[in-house]
Protein backbone atom coordinates (compact mmCIF):
# COMPACT_ATOMS: atom_id res chain seq x y z
CA UNK A 1 0.00 0.00 0.00
CA UNK A 2 1.31 3.45 -0.93
CA UNK A 3 0.48 6.10 1.62
CA UNK A 4 3.46 8.39 1.24
CA UNK A 5 3.19 12.09 1.90
CA UNK A 6 6.28 14.27 1.52
CA UNK A 7 6.70 17.46 3.52
CA UNK A 8 9.45 19.79 4.62
CA UNK A 9 11.00 18.62 7.88
CA UNK A 10 10.61 20.42 11.17
CA UNK A 11 12.97 20.60 14.13
CA UNK A 12 10.77 18.07 15.93
CA UNK A 13 11.52 15.48 13.23
CA UNK A 14 15.18 15.12 14.27
CA UNK A 15 14.63 11.96 16.35
CA UNK A 16 12.62 10.27 13.58
CA UNK A 17 15.16 11.27 10.91
CA UNK A 18 17.99 9.89 13.06
CA UNK A 19 16.07 6.64 13.57
CA UNK A 20 15.59 6.29 9.80
CA UNK A 21 19.26 7.03 9.17
CA UNK A 22 20.57 4.48 11.68
CA UNK A 23 18.13 1.71 10.76
CA UNK A 24 18.70 2.21 7.04
CA UNK A 25 22.48 2.27 7.37
CA UNK A 26 22.41 -0.94 9.40
CA UNK A 27 20.24 -2.69 6.80
CA UNK A 28 21.75 -1.28 3.61
CA UNK A 29 25.43 -1.26 4.55
CA UNK A 30 25.76 -4.47 6.60
CA UNK A 31 28.44 -6.51 4.85
CA UNK A 32 29.76 -3.40 3.10
CA UNK A 33 30.72 -1.04 5.94
CA UNK A 34 32.45 -2.54 9.01
CA UNK A 35 29.96 -3.93 11.54
CA UNK A 36 31.72 -1.99 14.31
CA UNK A 37 30.89 1.30 12.58
CA UNK A 38 27.23 0.34 12.12
CA UNK A 39 26.84 -1.07 15.63
CA UNK A 40 28.29 2.10 17.14
CA UNK A 41 25.78 4.38 15.42
CA UNK A 42 23.69 6.09 18.08
CA UNK A 43 20.21 7.48 17.35
CA UNK A 44 20.33 10.18 20.04
CA UNK A 45 23.74 11.40 18.84
CA UNK A 46 22.49 11.50 15.24
CA UNK A 47 19.33 13.33 16.33
CA UNK A 48 21.43 16.04 17.95
CA UNK A 49 23.40 16.40 14.72
CA UNK A 50 20.15 16.80 12.79
CA UNK A 51 18.97 19.47 15.22
CA UNK A 52 22.25 21.35 14.71
CA UNK A 53 22.00 20.97 10.93
CA UNK A 54 18.63 22.72 10.90
CA UNK A 55 20.54 26.02 10.77
CA UNK A 56 22.65 25.05 7.73
CA UNK A 57 21.83 26.18 4.22
CA UNK A 58 20.20 23.02 3.00
CA UNK A 59 16.75 21.51 2.95
CA UNK A 60 15.49 18.32 4.50
CA UNK A 61 12.17 16.77 3.59
CA UNK A 62 10.53 13.71 5.13
CA UNK A 63 8.25 11.01 3.78
CA UNK A 64 5.41 9.98 6.06
CA UNK A 65 3.07 7.02 6.07
CA UNK A 66 0.20 7.09 8.56
CA UNK A 67 1.83 10.14 10.24
CA UNK A 68 5.08 8.21 10.82
CA UNK A 69 8.35 9.38 9.26
CA UNK A 70 9.57 6.54 7.03
CA UNK A 71 12.27 8.35 5.06
CA UNK A 72 14.07 11.61 4.42
CA UNK A 73 16.09 13.47 1.82
CA UNK A 74 18.59 16.28 2.45
CA UNK A 75 19.88 18.52 -0.33
CA UNK A 76 21.36 21.92 -1.09
CA UNK A 77 24.24 23.53 -2.90
CA UNK A 78 26.97 21.18 -4.08
CA UNK A 79 29.88 21.01 -1.65
CA UNK A 80 32.43 19.95 -4.28
CA UNK A 81 35.05 22.49 -5.28
CA UNK A 82 35.30 21.29 -8.88
CA UNK A 83 31.75 22.16 -9.98
CA UNK A 84 30.02 25.42 -10.79
CA UNK A 85 27.65 27.31 -8.51
CA UNK A 86 24.80 26.12 -10.77
CA UNK A 87 25.12 22.58 -9.36
CA UNK A 88 23.10 21.35 -6.40
CA UNK A 89 23.65 18.18 -4.41
CA UNK A 90 21.50 15.40 -3.04
CA UNK A 91 23.31 15.01 0.29
CA UNK A 92 21.39 12.04 1.71
CA UNK A 93 18.31 9.96 0.98
CA UNK A 94 17.20 7.10 3.21
CA UNK A 95 14.00 5.10 3.68
CA UNK A 96 13.24 2.54 6.38
CA UNK A 97 13.90 -0.99 5.08
CA UNK A 98 10.29 -2.11 5.50
CA UNK A 99 9.27 0.73 3.15
CA UNK A 100 11.78 -0.07 0.38
CA UNK A 101 10.26 -0.41 -3.10
CA UNK A 102 6.98 1.17 -2.02
CA UNK A 103 7.42 4.63 -3.52
CA UNK A 104 8.85 6.62 -0.62
CA UNK A 105 12.36 6.81 -2.07
CA UNK A 106 11.12 7.92 -5.46
CA UNK A 107 8.78 10.49 -3.90
CA UNK A 108 11.64 11.95 -1.86
CA UNK A 109 13.95 11.91 -4.87
CA UNK A 110 11.40 13.65 -7.06
CA UNK A 111 10.82 16.34 -4.41
CA UNK A 112 14.58 16.89 -4.15
CA UNK A 113 14.98 17.26 -7.92
CA UNK A 114 12.01 19.65 -8.12
CA UNK A 115 13.26 21.78 -5.23
CA UNK A 116 16.82 21.97 -6.55
CA UNK A 117 15.53 22.95 -9.98
CA UNK A 118 13.24 25.54 -8.38
CA UNK A 119 16.26 27.05 -6.62
CA UNK A 120 17.91 27.67 -9.99
CA UNK A 121 20.32 24.74 -10.10
CA UNK A 122 20.86 23.27 -13.58
CA UNK A 123 22.45 20.00 -12.45
CA UNK A 124 22.85 17.98 -9.28
CA UNK A 125 25.41 15.57 -7.89
CA UNK A 126 25.40 12.90 -5.22
CA UNK A 127 27.95 10.51 -3.75
CA UNK A 128 27.33 6.76 -3.42
CA UNK A 129 29.43 3.95 -2.04
CA UNK A 130 30.95 2.08 -4.96
CA UNK A 131 30.39 -1.17 -3.06
CA UNK A 132 26.62 -0.57 -2.81
CA UNK A 133 25.03 -1.89 -6.02
CA UNK A 134 21.49 -1.37 -4.70
CA UNK A 135 21.95 2.37 -4.24
CA UNK A 136 23.72 2.73 -7.57
CA UNK A 137 20.90 0.89 -9.37
CA UNK A 138 18.31 3.13 -7.65
CA UNK A 139 20.09 6.29 -8.79
CA UNK A 140 20.74 5.02 -12.30
CA UNK A 141 17.07 4.08 -12.72
CA UNK A 142 16.24 7.70 -11.88
CA UNK A 143 18.56 9.16 -14.51
CA UNK A 144 21.80 9.65 -12.56
CA UNK A 145 25.11 8.78 -14.22
CA UNK A 146 28.54 8.29 -12.67
CA UNK A 147 30.71 11.21 -13.79
CA UNK A 148 34.10 9.59 -13.14
CA UNK A 149 34.92 11.36 -9.87
CA UNK A 150 35.78 9.18 -6.88
CA UNK A 151 37.01 9.86 -3.36
CA UNK A 152 38.16 7.55 -0.56
CA UNK A 153 36.24 7.62 2.72
CA UNK A 154 37.23 6.01 6.01
CA UNK A 155 34.66 3.92 7.89
CA UNK A 156 36.12 2.74 11.21
CA UNK A 157 39.54 2.18 9.68
CA UNK A 158 38.29 0.65 6.44
CA UNK A 159 38.77 2.75 3.34
CA UNK A 160 35.83 2.70 0.95
CA UNK A 161 35.39 4.47 -2.37
CA UNK A 162 32.61 6.97 -3.02
CA UNK A 163 31.51 7.50 -6.63
CA UNK A 164 29.99 10.79 -7.75
CA UNK A 165 26.80 10.74 -9.79
CA UNK A 166 25.36 13.64 -11.75
CA UNK A 167 22.14 14.47 -13.58
CA UNK A 168 20.50 17.39 -15.29
CA UNK A 169 17.58 19.02 -13.57
Q: Could you tell me what each predicted segment is?
A:
Residues 102:
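Flexible nucleotide-binding loop
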Residues 2-5:
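Extreme N-terminal starter segment of soluble prokaryotic enzymes
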Residues 8-12, 19-98, 106-111, 115, ...:
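Acetyl-CoA-dependent GNAT
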Residues 11-14, 132-133:
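Alpha-helix N-cap/helix-start and coil->helix boundary motif
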Residues 60, 86-88, 122-136, 140-169:
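C-terminal "cap" of GNAT-fold acetyltransferases
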Amino acid sequence: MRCVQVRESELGDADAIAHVQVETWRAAYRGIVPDMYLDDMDVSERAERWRQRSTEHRSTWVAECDSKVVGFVAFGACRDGDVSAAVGELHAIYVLPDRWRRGAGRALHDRCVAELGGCGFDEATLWALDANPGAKAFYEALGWEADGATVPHDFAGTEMILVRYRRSL
